[in-house]
Amino acid sequence: MNFLAHFFLAKREPAWVVGNFVADYLRNAEIAELPEAVRAGVALHRSVDAFTDRHPVVRQCAQRLFPFHGKYAPVVIDVFFDFFLIHNWERYSEEPFDVFVQKMYDILLEYREMLPQGLQERLPRMVSGGWLHSYGHIQGLEYAFLRLQSRMSKPEQLQGVIDSHHRYFDATNQDFNDFFPEVIAFASDWQVR
């Protein structure tokens, strides 16, 4: 799951949204210093990632993309699934997408001081660049993958990623819609523990 799906699964609880945002950017020692509710958001993020990585539908999708993107196939799926969440939004939420996105940006801006320095610096670009909206169109996907390539040891494995998106559009959309209700149920169950 990428930013958008993690925010969706955080149920708009501000501290959990923040925890989901910082989860991949902090070491465990730094996470231990966060308020308890934010740590719960980090734990939710990590639990969702583990559930996602083990899920048979996601594994099937990764196998389909592995010949083209190697070990980065799961990363490609994370971004593709945000695309399909946007395109299937009304199936999963009664709240308009634009309203949801603005709420997420408002939460992150309100809690900006809790973010690590790098995310504090990136957040204004994320908001002004409409990153969450951008996952819903091809140009935005291209830009997201360019950002990812700059942090990868084998960036060449993301070449042709938009071709993969087009080639497997219907299959990946079906995979997303088979998987997403199950991860929603998992996250809801996790949150009531």
What are these regions (language model features)?
Residues 1-89, 164-193:
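An N-terminal structural lobe/cap that precedes and organizes the functional/catalytic core
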Residues 13, 92-95, 136:
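Short coil/turn linker and secondary-structure boundary residues
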Residues 19-20, 94-98, 157-161:
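Short coil/turn segments at secondary-structure boundaries
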